[in-house]
Amino acid sequence: MVVLLCAVAGQFGCEALRNSRGMQITYNYVKTADGVTLALRRYKPDQVAADRDPVILCHGLGYNLLFWDLADRTSLARYLAREGFDVWSLSLRGAYPSSQSLNSTLRKMSRFNLPPEMLKTLQKRLGDIRITNWSVDDHIQLDVPTAIAFVQAETGHKRVHWIGHSMGGMVMFAYLQDPSRARNAHSFVAVSVPMAVFHPLSEPLTFMHESENALRLGSKVVGSSAPAAVGTVLGDMGLPMDRLFYNGDNIDEGVLRGLFYLAQEEISPGQLGQLLAMVRSERFTSVDGQMDYTGGLCEVTTPTYLLAGTVDNLATVGAVQFAFRQINSTEKEYDLFGRVNGQRNDYGHDDIIIGRQAKAEVYPRIAAWLERFPCRPHESDMMLQPVVPSSAAAAEEEG
């Protein structure tokens, strides 16, 4: 197992450095109001289109910013950069290389996952490992506003495009319900985003619901490290929980192993508890129950493009269609990806971004949506008060 993990580590470590011609890739850091460090990986093309606002990519639950860049053939980050967009891939708190708990860091090391950026920043940010728990509310109220303000300041653009996968889209739907904040978003691309969970549950969600106590215990004892290590070596094991996250027939084994090795992160008790409550109640609410984010969808007026997969067992077709109907955006679109609409395969939760044909069938639709919303004249010239990053941007060397 150790030998295999080391071999896989070498393979993916090289892949991450390839194919960066035509763009500069850097890591950037900024602190939230409560002192947590957030990381953003910037893909700045040599020629940035003047009429395009920057794009922020936000991963889902249990992943990090590398979800968007596992390999060149499944990298939405590089695809959009080559289309002339200034792309910023965000890691929310708890995800590499943003602030992580000590347990997360140690568990990564135990499976020989030692990303170069983690090694470079670990000694400089020892205080960051003090965080032990966080909720989705923390992402909404602290992480998202900080990331957007940082990108605005660094680029001089008044607004950004936000592309969120799963939880990375849920936090944006919640953020957009505040009109004073919504003005910062030019458009929103919601990829496989469940803002409701309808009963009766799908078979994989039923398994998750019935295994709630075991999931809580497993999260505390071994976290994601054990399944990530096994998945790195064995790939698709066809387990019931796996069917929540991907269609095994629509994803290359090498990419899947890369997902487990590079992008898998720990899920905090707060995150897990909040999302398990959603499975029970059918609604996405704040931890204290005071905010009903599902009920607040009607407050969203930002231009929004919603994508769903025909065999997504987490963000089901019905759940995505529900969000589409509830939002009050005058400009909104919905696309369903699968054989029924001419795609070469049926799409699941993760493979709508990292699937075999996603680059050919999904990415162009996303780019076309973004191109519909050029920034207004002089809007990109509005320089905002700079946000001082917690450490200097580190340029990634080309391989």
Spans of features found by a protein language model:
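Alpha/beta-hydrolase-fold enzymes
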Residues: 153-158, 163, 167-288
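Catalytic active-site module of serine/aspartate enzymes centered on a nucleophile-bearing elbow/loop
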Residues: 333-399
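Short alpha-helix in the alpha/beta-hydrolase fold that links the catalytic acid
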Residues: 302, 316-326
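Short beta-strand/loop motif that positions the catalytic acidic residue
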Residues: 300, 306-308, 312
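Glycine-rich His-Gly loop
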Residues: 57-63, 165-166, 309-310
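N-terminal cap/lid segment of alpha/beta-hydrolase-fold proteins
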Residues: 16-47
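Alpha/beta-hydrolase active-site loop
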Residues: 109-153
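Short, surface-exposed "cap/lid" segments of acyl-processing enzymes
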Residues: 45-106
